[in-house]
């Protein structure tokens, strides 16, 4: 690796921090940068030595401290503008705690209310985080979700069809897409999409929460490919914890003369009866005492990313993706979600299957096991991208509604007493890890091999764990009985006349090599049968229902794992049940993605022939459902693809020409 990448890796706080788990001491291996970055010693040292000594409020420059603090904050804004190629027409606004705050700020500026809502439409992409869906939904505006195509990227034909349709209807059109998925890391061609948007008079808004720390952000790459707004969460950058959200947007979008958070710092003059807001959008939209140190830190993390270079990061991450697929594609127990050939960041969401039962290992169990065995900090769940997660898991709307039953409180007399509260254990999900570009090769290999090992043998440790059906949390049966003593607390701090006291020991580093940790984990997995002998889980707590809801239990439970372990002892090999469990959903795999959801020319032509006979295909767009392959029979699908009118006309024209030639030949 480059020396600068090694410098970053060495400066991460907690890089060698140890903790005690059920299988001994482990070192923190952080693989959750997609959720949040980690602080850097270099940046925090600069803030402690240079920023804090001169810290003051920025709403004046009359004193040395306020003047210096104002200078630091303006430097941060200027650095960010340069890093994103912002022009004079662009504003950089620090706001909220992340992308969510930035989106709310933009929505307020657009004045989406009253009659404007009825004539506005927002197109969201296939990968969207809830932060880029829910704020738009709550305005009452029409929302249309653009699907992905067979390559796993944005379906540009579908987007263009809708843009054409709503331009003719004279709608205000907003396209709010993610530059990269926080689930699969798959990238979107932001320039191509922006150019298409502007061709039809739409505004292009971009969520860079996942992509921002790694990809080049260019507000003005081409004359027509400019971005109207970008939302950012700098806390996801390495060194970024404790930074505000960022909204970078064209100044013309701020149509609302009243700022999103009016108050101190937003006005030029206030009388007893009137007030005058500031002309500067950046000042007017940052009401109250701003997040001063946080903004300065944001400028520093952008400065660091620019020093590394987006091209260096991209090359490093491409290499990480290649290594990951080389190892994991050989393991039949691992299903990596999303298209494997699409350009992506090294963000991987996966399912772990227990082959003999046909069930999955619960994502929270896998995450806990990676922590306990290897120290790997992963994340389980749906990554706050529910619609995309359901696409990837193969969960249609009907099945999703069936799962919703488990997440609602029940008061009916016919519901078992223990199940009246929501059962989050039943919520489908996946395990997500990401590999930061500055992680050294040895650690990358350690993480890849650890996941491969857990995927193959992790189920054997299920009997040693128990779950809370209401929260979905998993914990080791014996180790966590005294878990309260194993975490730090602010209540450890006390004060007396002499000063403050911290009544606990400082976290210590753990210097065992990665090879030693891997060997310890392997030994634990090899001894799983012996470790489970004293545990009787056959009559243990389990999820079970009296009706057809049992068919929705998709994960292997501890008592079931004990049964399979007993089978291994008796016959010296895994023994599958007579009937393998049929999962209530089928996750998308590359082979399944190529067979469904996207129309082929044969079905389009057949559909248009029927429409022509019924004389209804001349004015409206046609909804064409997917065909599994060019020669196969149609399949039932919940999703539809809109065929543009021009494409229909071309097909009809070709067919007419072909029929004319046949007619001439017959004559």
Task: Please give the residue ranges for each predicted region.
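Extreme C-terminal disordered tails of eukaryotic proteins encode short linear targeting/docking signals used
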Residues: 581-667
């Amino acid at each position: 690796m480059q020396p600068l990448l090694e410098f970053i890796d060495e400066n991460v706080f907690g890089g060698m921090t140890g903790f005690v788990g059920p299988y001994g001491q482990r070192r923190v291996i952080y693989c959750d940068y997609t959720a949040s970055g980690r602080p850097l010693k270099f940046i925090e040292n600069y803030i402690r030595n240079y920023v804090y000594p001169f810290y003051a409020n920025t709403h004046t420059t009359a004193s040395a401290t306020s003047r210096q603090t104002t200078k630091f904050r303006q430097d941060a804004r200027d650095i960010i503008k340069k890093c994103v190629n912002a022009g004079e027409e662009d504003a950089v606004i620090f706001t909220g705690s992340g992308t969510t705050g930035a989106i709310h700020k933009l929505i307020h500026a657009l004045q989406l209310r009253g009659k404007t809502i009825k004539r506005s439409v927002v197109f969201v992409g296939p990968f969207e985080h809830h932060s880029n869906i829910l704020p738009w939904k709550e305005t009452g505006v029409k929302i249309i979700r653009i699907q992905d195509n067979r390559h796993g990227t944005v379906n540009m034909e579908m987007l263009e069809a809708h843009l054409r349709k709503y331009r003719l209807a004279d709608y205000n059109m907003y396209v709010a897409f993610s530059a990269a998925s926080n689930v699969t890391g798959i990238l979107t061609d932001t320039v191509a999409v922006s150019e298409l948007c502007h061709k039809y008079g739409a505004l292009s808004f971009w969520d860079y929460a996942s992509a921002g720390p790694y990809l080049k952000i260019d507000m003005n790459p081409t004359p027509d490919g400019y971005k109207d707004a970008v939302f950012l969460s700098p806390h996801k950058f390495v060194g970024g914890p404790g930074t505000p959200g960022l909204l970078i947007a064209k100044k013309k979008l701020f149509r609302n003369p009243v700022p999103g958070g009016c108050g101190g710092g937003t006005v030029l003059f206030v009388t007893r009866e009137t007030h005058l807001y500031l002309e500067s959008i950046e000042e007017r939209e940052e009401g109250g005492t701003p997040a001063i140190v946080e903004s300065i830190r944001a400028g520093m993390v952008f400065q660091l990313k620019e020093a590394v270079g987006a091209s260096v990061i991209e090359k490093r991450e491409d290499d990480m993706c290649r290594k990951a697929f080389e190892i994991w594609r050989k393991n039949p127990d691992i299903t990596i979600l999303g298209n494997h050939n699409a350009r992506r960041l090294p963000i991987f969401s996966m399912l772990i299957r227990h082959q003999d039962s046909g069930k999955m290992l619960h994502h929270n169990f896998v995450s806990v096991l990676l922590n306990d065995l290897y120290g790997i900090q992963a994340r389980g769940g749906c990554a706050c991208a529910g619609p995309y997660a359901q696409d990837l898991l193969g969960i249609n709307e009907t099945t999703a509604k069936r799962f919703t039953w488990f997440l609602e409180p029940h008061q009916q007399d016919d519901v078992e007493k223990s199940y009246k509260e929501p059962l989050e254990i039943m919520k489908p999900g996946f395990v997500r890890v990401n590999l930061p570009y500055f992680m050294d090769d040895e650690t990358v290999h350690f993480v890849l091999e650890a996941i491969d090992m857990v995927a193959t043998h992790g189920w054997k440790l299920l009997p040693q764990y128990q779950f809370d059906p209401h929260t979905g949390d998993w914990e080791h049966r014996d180790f966590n009985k005294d878990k309260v003593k194993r975490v730090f607390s602010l209540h450890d701090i006390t004060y007396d006349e002499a000063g403050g006291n911290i009544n606990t020991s400082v976290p210590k580093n753990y210097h065992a090599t990665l090879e030693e940790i891997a060997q310890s984990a392997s030994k634990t997995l090899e001894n799983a049968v012996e470790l489970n002998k004293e545990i009787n889980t056959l009559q243990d707590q389990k999820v079970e229902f009296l009706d057809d809801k049992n068919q929705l239990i998709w994960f292997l439970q501890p008592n079931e794992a004990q049964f399979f372990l007993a089978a291994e002892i008796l016959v010296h090999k895994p023994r599958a049940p007579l009937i393998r469990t049929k999962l209530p959903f089928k996750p998308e795999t590359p082979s399944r993605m190529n067979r469904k959801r996207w129309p082929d020319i044969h079905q389009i032509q057949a559909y248009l022939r029927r429409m022509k006979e019924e004389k209804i295909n001349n004015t409206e767009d046609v909804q064409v459902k997917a065909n599994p392959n060019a020669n196969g029979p149609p399949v039932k699908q919940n999703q539809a693809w809109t065929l543009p009118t021009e494409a229909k006309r071309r097909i009809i024209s070709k067919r007419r020409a072909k029929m004319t030639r046949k007619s001439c030949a017959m004559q």
